Amino acid sequence: MKLLYCLLLVILALVGLSSGAKPSDKLQIGVKYRPDECTVKTKSGDKLKIHYTGTLLNGDKFDSSVDRGTPFEFKIGVGQVIKGWDQGVLGMCVGEKRKLIIPPSLGYGQQGAGDKIPGNSHLIFDVELIGIN
């Protein structure tokens, strides 16, 4: 009986994956690594140093501070970055790593950005908080 139940779950999962389901229209935040000790978490108004790699859903990389060897610096919560970043890095600890899946409404919307990010693109960012000032 357990085998039949497990087989049914696997079949349902495969059907869901192969259906070409539309990505979520909500920000998705996955914690990949969190330090054991965290005395300070990011909050609105903090100036952050972050390493990131940005890709589209198809895996095409469009930008990476890691490749440049220089962390990106910005002030959180004041509109210096896309809304998905402002929301997605709140509450992070130095050393923490997250995966952000950002819908178009919190990214670059219908217009896209340059020639590397088409309009209505979901964005995937692997981010690591390097420092808080």
UniProtKB/Swiss-Prot annotation:
<keyword id="KW-0413">Isomerase</keyword>
<keyword id="KW-0697">Rotamase</keyword>
<dbReference type="InterPro" id="IPR044609">
    <property type="entry name" value="FKBP2/11"/>
</dbReference>
<feature type="domain" description="PPIase FKBP-type">
    <location>
        <begin position="45"/>
        <end position="133"/>
    </location>
</feature>
<dbReference type="GO" id="GO:0003755">
    <property type="term" value="F:peptidyl-prolyl cis-trans isomerase activity"/>
</dbReference>
<keyword id="KW-0732">Signal</keyword>
<feature type="signal peptide">
    <location>
        <begin position="1"/>
        <end position="20"/>
    </location>
</feature>
<protein>
    <recommendedName>
        <fullName>FK506-binding protein 2</fullName>
        <ecNumber>5.2.1.8</ecNumber>
    </recommendedName>
</protein>
<dbReference type="InterPro" id="IPR001179">
    <property type="entry name" value="PPIase_FKBP_dom"/>
</dbReference>
<dbReference type="GO" id="GO:0005783">
    <property type="term" value="C:endoplasmic reticulum"/>
</dbReference>
<dbReference type="GO" id="GO:0061077">
    <property type="term" value="P:chaperone-mediated protein folding"/>
</dbReference>
<comment type="similarity">
    <text>Belongs to the FKBP-type PPIase family.</text>
</comment>
<dbReference type="Pfam" id="PF00254">
    <property type="entry name" value="FKBP_C"/>
</dbReference>
<comment type="function">
    <text>PPIases accelerate the folding of proteins by catalyzing the cis-trans isomerization of proline imidic peptide bonds in oligopeptides.</text>
</comment>
<dbReference type="InterPro" id="IPR046357">
    <property type="entry name" value="PPIase_dom_sf"/>
</dbReference>
